[in-house]
Amino acid sequence: DPRFVIVGNHDVPYWSLMARVFSPWKAFERATGHPAHDHEFLSPDLMVRGVVTARGWQARMNWSKGVIDLDQTRQAAEALRQAPVGALRVLACHHPLVEMIGAPMTGEVKRGEAAARIFAEAGVELIATGHVHVPFALPISLADHCSYAVGCGTLSHRERGAPPSFNQIDWDALHITVTAMAWIGDRFEPDQVWRLPRRQDTRLPATAPDPNQAGAMEKAAV
């Protein structure tokens, strides 16, 4: 079965400053067999663009927080615009680009909210993230509000007010259903469910984002 793996801040070597600077993703790539850089999955019904928001080091004290730079944003937006008409367009990254109010921790992604709006302009339906260890689904404030920031829980024992969980995502022409599958001690069971109306503009050639033309917000980004 296809697997799509995104690197996160816990994949960075904690104690070795040299490894953080020069080879932060070596252990991740060796363990998963997947490259730790922006990449994508494409099929007729699904397009997933992965963006690395974790950094080996950065110019602030808390290196666990996220960053998405302008080049990453533009390249991901261009890839999203190339998705087949009608396909579910997903942007996957470790840190939430849109913060959940009341979450036990934050991603504090530099340029995160601006990037989320650019991705929505490019046709994204889901921005799928982790990091905060609790599941959520929030609309992105743009156009018809049918682009969503969706966070998943964690399979770690480091709980932050929610049981260990993962998200199961199902979709049809009209809705996306996100089910947080929580660990109850001996098995996973549905815990929270969000039924999200799908964007309809990306399902028609006449209204889908132009694959050859950047949107206004993307053009204006500096």
Language-model-derived ranges and their functions:
Residues 1-78, 83, 118-120, 143, ...:
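Extended active-site neighborhood of metal-dependent phosphoesterases/phosphodiesterases
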Residues 2-5, 47, 88, 125-126, ...:
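Proline-centered loop/turn at the N-terminus of a beta-strand
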Residues 8-9, 94, 131:
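Active-site glycine-centered loops adjacent to acidic/histidine catalytic or metal-binding residues
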Residues 50-55, 93-95, 180-182:
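Short, structured patches in soluble enzyme cores that scaffold and shape functional sites
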Residues 55-57, 95-99, 133-135:
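Short, catalytically relevant binding-site loops at active-site mouths
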Residues 80, 84-100:
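Short acidic, glycine-rich surface-loop motifs adjacent to enzyme active sites
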Residues 101-177:
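Conserved beta-sheet core of the metallophosphoesterase superfamily
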Residues 171-222:
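A short C-terminal boundary segment appended to hydrolase-like catalytic domains
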